[in-house]
C-alpha cells in the first residue's frame, strides 16, 4: 500500500481500508494490525496542541477564580466588586485632579515627583535599628517619611500665612510646624530616644 498525501490523510485511508475488509476472512488480523500500529491514531498538529493547552489554562484559571457563586450574588444584589471599587477610586481621583487650580496642580505634581533617597533612608534605618533592613522596608520607611515631610511643610505654610510672611518657607516656619506637630503627637508613637530635628 503506497502512502500518498499528508500524514493526516494516511490514518483516514487506513481506517477506510479496515472497514472495507471487514467482510473478508482476514479482517480480524487487519483490524488488530491497524489498531496496534501507531499510525492508526493521528498525531495532533501544533495548532491542536496549542488549543488544548489554552483550554487547559482557561480551565485552571476558572478554577482559580472560583468564588463559589459569590460574584453572581453580588452582581444581583448590586454590591460592587473589587474592580468596581478600583474604578470608582480612579474616577474620584480624576474628578479631584480636574477640580484643582493651577497652583494646586503644580504642588500635587511636585509632591508626586518628590522622593527621598532610598539608599540614605536604608543607611539611616540600619544605623538606628542596629540591623540590616530589607529594600522593601526601606521603601515603606521612605514612603511614610515623605508623607511626614509633606504634613510638616503643609503646617509650615499655614503658619507662614498666620504670621503674614511672604516668600519661601523659612526655618522658623518649619521649627514652629514641628513643635506644633509634637504637641499634637497623639497619633505618632512615642520613642525613648529624644532627638532634635531642628536645632
UniProtKB/Swiss-Prot annotation:
SUPFAM superfamilies, sorted: Histone-fold
Composition skew (Low complexity), residue ranges: 31-45
Subcellular location: Cytoplasm; Nucleus
Sequence ranges of Basic and acidic residues compositional bias: 46-57
Region Disordered, annotated ranges: 1-88
Key words, A-Z: Cytoplasm, Nucleus, Transcription, Transcription regulation
GO biological process: RNA polymerase II preinitiation complex assembly; transcription initiation at RNA polymerase II promoter
MF-aspect GO terms: protein heterodimerization activity; RNA polymerase II general transcription initiation factor activity
Pfam families, per database record: TAFII28
Main localisation: cytoplasm
InterPro entries according to UniProt: Histone-fold, TAF11-like, TAFII28_dom
GO cellular component: chromatin; cytosol; nucleus; transcription factor TFIID complex
Thylakoid found in the keyword field: no
Bias (Polar residues) ranges: 1-26
Gene3D superfamilies membership: Histone, subunit A
Disulfide bridge map: none
Function according to Swiss-Prot or TrEMBL: Functions as a component of the DNA-binding general transcription factor complex TFIID. Binding of TFIID to a promoter (with or without TATA element) is the initial step in pre-initiation complex (PIC) formation. TFIID plays a key role in the regulation of gene expression by RNA polymerase II through different activities such as transcription activator interaction, core promoter recognition and selectivity, TFIIA and TFIIB interaction, chromatin modification (histone acetylation by TAF1), facilitation of DNA opening and initiation of transcription.
Family: Belongs to the TAF11 family.
Name by which UniProt lists this protein: Transcription initiation factor TFIID subunit 11
